[in-house]
Amino acid sequence: AGFAGDDAPRAVFPSIVGRPRHTGVMVGMGQKDAYDGDEAQSKRGILTLKYPIEHGIVSNWDDMEKIWHHTFYNELRVAPEEHPVLLTEAPLNPKANREKMTQIMFETFNVPAMYVAIQAVLSLYASGRTTGIVLDSGDGVSHTVPIYEGYALPHAILRLDLAGRDLTDNLMKILTERGYMFTTTAEREIVRDMKEKLAYVALDYEQEIETARSSSSIEKNYELPDGQVITIGAERFGCPEVLFQPSMIGMEAAGIHETTYNSIMKCDVDIRKDLYGNIVLSGGSTMFPGIADRMSKEITALAPSSMKIKVVAPPERKYSVWIGGSILASLSTFQQ
């Protein structure tokens, strides 16, 4: 969250609401019945964490309202009734969802004006393009969204319910098989951090497994909050490999490369060349080192041999949806 015209968000915190697992015994400790975002994160040891957004779509409106309240009053410290608001939504977000979002903004927060933009379109704006295909992969959902001259092509948008949270869960499972205990919502956050710091995408998965077997060159250490040190090797690239091979976690779905290709193939034959040449990665789950090269390699193998493939991975892509929103909302034509 932040202000239009800024080049980076003022506030970045997880969309979680935490509630105490136990009732407080110490009177006057000022315990709250709910914590949001970073505060929920830091007190996670005593809380049960809930995620009001599932697969990119709001599923718990009471908790979502708490998060918005926290955003306006504690993070941005603004009066919502004084500022027009730009919200973003997942592609193919149900209409009822958008209506509920609008209702809460106008009725609960009394905002003067609001607009809801599709996330992937904003990422494309942020990359300085109006035509291309965006692979947007966050925590709960991934989408491939072809965009032509600024318009998303809804018939060709594909959704993949596979994203960051699944990769974290997969890493938890691998570590549990190795004898480490990671089960609670709080411990999931530790594993998420491990994933973000150490995981990478192999250019050639089979070959990387050979390398991991024969040498310790890819091993890295990670220190847990209690001082215990874990060494991870093949898990580093095994964790995000799921994006390309969902069958690894028992999912019957095409990987992100194939989904991108399928999405392009649903578009008019005349615009495919423009899409192949402008494949833009967006979202936190595209931050793995090596992902752009691998994506390029996989799509080159699927596409016609004469086709020029270009995969763009902007360094700020973790926040490119927000940055695109900042650009859009600061245009005078948009404000009218």
UniProtKB/Swiss-Prot annotation:
- Localized where? Cytoplasm, Cytoskeleton
Q: Which reaction does it catalyse?
A: ATP + H2O = ADP + phosphate + H(+)
Could you provide one GO biological process annotation from this protein's UniProt record? cell division
Q: Which InterPro entries match?
A: Actin, Actin/actin-like_CS, ATPase_NBD
Q: Name one Pfam family in it.
A: Actin
UniProt xrefs under PANTHER family: ACTIN (PTHR11937)
Summarizing the function annotation, the protein's role is: Actins are highly conserved proteins that are involved in various types of cell motility and are ubiquitously expressed in all eukaryotic cells. Essential component of cell cytoskeleton; plays an important role in cytoplasmic streaming, cell shape determination, cell division, organelle movement and extension growth.
Q: What is this protein called?
A: Actin-51
The organism is Solanum lycopersicum
Write the lineage as a comma-separated list.
Eukaryota, Viridiplantae, Streptophyta, Embryophyta, Tracheophyta
